[in-house]
Curated annotation (Swiss-Prot):
This is Protein LATE ELONGATED HYPOCOTYL. The modification Phosphoserine is found at residue 6. Induction: Circadian-regulation with peak levels occurring in the morning. It is found in: Nucleus.
Length: 770
């Protein structure tokens, strides 16, 4: 046996890394000698050894070399002599391994110091907690770490090299506390604060002089002026980019002019910066200019502290938003300190949050709005929206008067055109931008409060009770009483007008509502239909002078509630889908509970029930025509529970008699139910009789006359041209899909149970649904 052919005398391993499958021939002496020659010449270059041997592949050569080297080491270990003395051959050293593609540290580098591990492969490969607090690591891209002691210029060059390679990357920096944002304004040797605890998982940027490279030639990057006393800091990337009101900056794009005008108007309230800041800022302008455009920038104010920031490519400012935010004062006192007076010097320095779109994001319902600037952006919408709101209010004079009166109490400090305290606004004040914005803000706040209470806008945060002016619930009731439909469901039901008796002058309505609110709390109840919610709002919001009209509205709604309760019976025959009448019954029961126990809406319960109420409102408003149980089905349910028989055993004659009696009673009750104000109708009958009203009227006439032949004539109308369908006996059929199943005779049950002809009413297109 060739001693070099195999390593059988070695320890047999359980798993071999590679096995030759095609060529099983052993190595010959000639091949092994050429292998040894090539090994001395080329070392571990297997490709060159393959060319030198010519009969073996590189994989075979490497496998043979592995076995050969293992055999040599074992023989040298047994003899106790070096390998070079055993066979006069030196095993070439292993080639240096490739650099790992993954940034994770190996097991052997656990005890290695942090700096060595971080620069081993040119990438930051240490876990997050092991980064030193006083050292900021950089992703140098095969560049050594430069300590930040006296190395500001070197770090600027390092940043330049980094930005060339990572131009499109953003830097996610984690803020480890408020101490990272503390900056001394008196120091002239530092314009950018170094965060002591700012770290990253993948890359961490040490902030020093020259990090923000301003493009002086193009004037497209926000340039810090000499007397703006701002200091830039890279902090939390999760927050939005916030411009300080005193920062006279030029924004990206074409919004530069509006921001400069707005900032120049606010710059007079700021303290002055030392003169050497101008010289130092000029020096900073000349650092390399290839820093990425969209950099997380933090603007510090000398009086109010720091707010995290981040720029986005789609950032833009509206002129209207700038003017509105600049003119709004004192709104933060609603949450922080109700007793303190709001002055322009106190809040003009606060940072304004950027508006990425025309409408700001709503805050979650569980997190109170603690930042007054966020609340300003929440309420201050664009001038286009304000003009739309005011134009909608002008269509209803009473609603506009109420909104104007509410705007007079609104904490919107109007410096250009203040609103009169009596609520009598002239046309010039209404058309002016600040007054129009105040009216729009009050209207939006009232609608927001109503929606938050009734579930149409679940994400909106409700108002708190720390108001120093008119409470928001009273303000919402002002708008609801004087304009129940225009403010809330104007888009859905634009043709429906409010009743004439509800329109009142704005001051009287507001004063009466203030007295009512001071006497007792106003109950709020969820609504299941827009018409019912309108009636309840009118009933809750009427003043003492309209008590009689309010009683009329109450009497109008009470028969409807009783009728709904009489008509709805919960089925125990296997139909687990509630009809919309059951949903309306639940809503009316909740309404009565809310009237008996008037309580303020719980903030924690609003979030859970708001979505259900919202979905219920949308479905009941738009889809009542097909969700309603048909008239025949409702009559069959009443007959079912009164006679205690199964629906399969209904006979045609008995059902028609029962239905005729019930319809006759309903026909007598309908004229009495319409009430004094003819606009109040039975909602259930109006929705359910869309498709079957003509049939019911014809049947009622025939039953009143007692003519059986007329009933037979009416039967084809119900069957839509005598279309008789074959239906197999499958047990209980829901009356939502098959409203009536009558049999020709009860005697035919025993003979033809498999196939029986049933009178099945086809559904019209208005009711057809899957």
């Amino acid at each position: 046996m060739d001693p070099y052919s195999s390593g059988e005398e070695l320890v047999v391993k359980t798993r071999k890394p590679y096995t030759i499958t095609k060529q099983r021939e052993r190595w010959t002496e000639e091949e092994h000698n050429r292998f040894l020659e090539a090994l001395k010449l080329y070392g571990r270059a297997w490709q060159r050894i393959e060319e030198h041997i010519g009969t073996k592949t590189a994989v075979q050569i490497r496998s043979h070399a592995q076995k050969f080297f293992t055999k040599l080491e074992k023989e040298a270990l047994i003899k106790g002599v070096p390998i070079s003395e055993a066979l006069d051959i030196e095993i070439p050293p292993p080639r240096p391994k490739r650099k790992p593609s993954n940034p994770y540290p190996r097991k052997t580098s656990i005890a290695v110091p942090t700096s060595q591990v971080g620069t081993k492969d040119g990438k930051l490969s240490t876990p997050f907690p092991s980064i030193c607090e006083n050292r900021n690591l950089l992703d140098l891209e095969k560049e050594p770490i430069i300590e930040s002691v006296g190395g500001n210029e070197k770090l600027s060059n390092v940043q330049e090299n980094q930005n060339k390679k990572n131009f499109s990357q953003g830097f996610t920096l984690f803020k480890e506390g408020a101490s990272a944002a503390s900056v001394s304004l008196g120091k002239s040797s530092q314009t950018l604060a170094e965060p002591t605890d700012s770290c990253t998982l993948n890359e961490s940027v040490s902030v020093s002089k020259g990090v923000i490279n301003h493009d002086v030639a193009n004037k497209s990057f926000p340039a810090v002026e000499s007397k703006g006393h701002q200091q830039l800091d890279i902090l939390d990337a999760k927050q939005s980019f916030q411009f300080d009101s005193s920062c006279n900056t030029s924004s990206v794009g074409k919004s530069c002019q509006s921001n400069e005008k707005w900032a120049q108007g606010e710059q007079k309230d700021q303290p002055s910066q030392p003169d050497h800041f101008e010289e130092f800022s000029r020096n900073d302008m000349q650092v390399p200019h290839n820093y990425p455009r969209h950099v997380p920038v933090h603007i510090l104010d000398g009086t109010l502290g720091a707010n995290g920031a981040q720029t986005t490519p789609d950032m833009f400012y509206h002129k209207s938003v700038s003017h509105q935010v600049g003119g709004l004062q004192g709104l933060s006192d609603m949450y922080t300190n109700p007793a303190s007076s709001a002055t322009s010097e106190q809040h003009s320095n606060a940072a304004r949050s950027s508006i990425h779109q025309s409408f700001p994001c709503f805050h979650p319902i569980f997190t109170p709005i603690r930042d007054p600037d966020d609340y300003r952006s929440f309420l201050q919408l664009s001038s286009t929206f304000s003009s739309l709101v005011v134009s909608a209010l002008l269509q209803n004079p009473a609603a506009h008067a109420a909104a104007s009166f509410a705007a007079s109490f609104w904490p919107y400090a109007n410096m250009e055109a203040p609103v009169d305290s009596t609520g009598n606004n002239t046309a010039s004040q209404i058309n002016s931008a600040p007054s129009m914005a105040a009216i729009a803000a009050a209207t939006v706040a009232a609608a927001t409060a109503w929606w938050a209470a009734h579930g149409l806008l679940p994400l909106c945060s409700p108002f708190h009770s720390s108001l120093t002016c008119v409470p928001t619930s009273a303000t919402s009731m002002q708008v609801d009483v004087c304009q129940p439909k225009e403010g809330k469901s104007e888009g859905r039901e634009g043709t429906h007008n409010s009743p004439p008796h509800v329109q009142q002058p704005g001051p009287e309505c507001s004063e009466a509502l203030q007295e009512q609110h001071s006497a007792s709390k106003l109950p709020t109840s969820p609504s299941s239909d827009s018409g019912e919610s309108e009636g309840r709002n009118l009933k809750n919001g009427l003043t003492a002078t309209d008590t009689e009209q309010g009683a009329a509205v109450t009497e109008t709604h009470e028969p409807n509630a009783e009728k709904v309760r009489k008509q709805v019976d919960r089925s125990s025959c296997g139909s687990n889908t509630p009809s919309s009448s059951e949903v309306e019954t639940d809503a009316l029961e909740k309404d009565e509970k809310g009237k008996e126990e008037p309580e303020e809406p719980n903030v924690n319960l609003l979030a859970g029930d708001a979505a259900n109420r919202r979905g219920r409102n949308c479905i009941s408003n738009s889809n009542d025509s097909w969700k309603e149980v048909s008239e025949e089905g409702r009559m069959a349910f009443q007959a079912l529970f009164s006679r205690e028989v199964l629906p399969q055993s209904f006979s045609r004659s008995n059902y028609l008699k029962t239905k005729g009696n019930i319809d006759f009673e309903k026909f007598q009750q309908k004229p009495d139910e319409q009430g004094p104000s003819g606009s109040q109708l039975d909602l259930n009958d109006q929705a359910s009789n869309i498709c079957s009203s003509h049939q019911a009227v014809e049947e009622n006439v025939q039953f009143l006359l007692g003519n059986k032949e007329g009933a037979e004539k009416c039967q084809p109308t119900m069957e839509l041209g005598e279309i008789r369908l074959k239906a197999r006996r499958t047990g209980f059929k829901p009356y939502k899909r098959c409203s009536l199943e009558a049999k020709d005779s009860r005697v035919a049950n025993s003979s033809c149970q498999d196939e029986e002809k049933s009178c099945k009413r086809l559904r019209l297109e208005g009711e057809a649904s899957t």
